[in-house]
Amino acid sequence: MAGGKKTNQGMKLGRTKPGEFDALVALAAGTGMFKKLEIEVLGELLRDWHASLATEGHLCRTLREADGTPVGFVYHAPAVMTKGTWHLYWLVVDKNAQGRGLGRRMVRHAEADARKLGAHHLLAETSGTARYAPTRAFYDKVGYSVEARVRDFYAPGDDQVIYRKDLRR
């Protein structure tokens, strides 16, 4: 550790391995940002991805410490029945590793993946509640803009905020 703060040296982003699923679910749960149902759905999604969704263009990348320990992951995929629209479904960074540019790194990788596969824009959605203000600030900071807001989408008083980034620029 340099100056008491962990560095990002030696971290590698690569294809998610089936043996990492439990660790990734634990990372997401450990952030304190996701509801119990969302965590359960994530576990199912990762198993489905490994079983079949990877053949449909869904991509899951894990960011690992030099020793191989997962510190984050990004899950992104083409939107069904569209040409060039992709979704950034999951972006998770270990609670203790946030603020070190790791989320930005994974988003940039997801953008590059999608661009290579013909995407012209990438969408990300989040909640409009105060609790998710840091998430919305993150998307603003990495160049996404609000494309739409669906009032009361998740629950009364909990809007869905959809962010978009044009990948052609």
What do the PLM-derived regions correspond to, one by one?
Residues 114-127:
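Conserved GNAT acetyl-CoA-binding A-motif
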Residues 92, 128-130:
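Active-site-proximal loop/turn and secondary-structure-junction residues that shape catalytic pockets
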Residues 101-103:
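Conserved G/P- and acidic residue-centered "switch" motifs that form tight phosphate/ATP-binding loops
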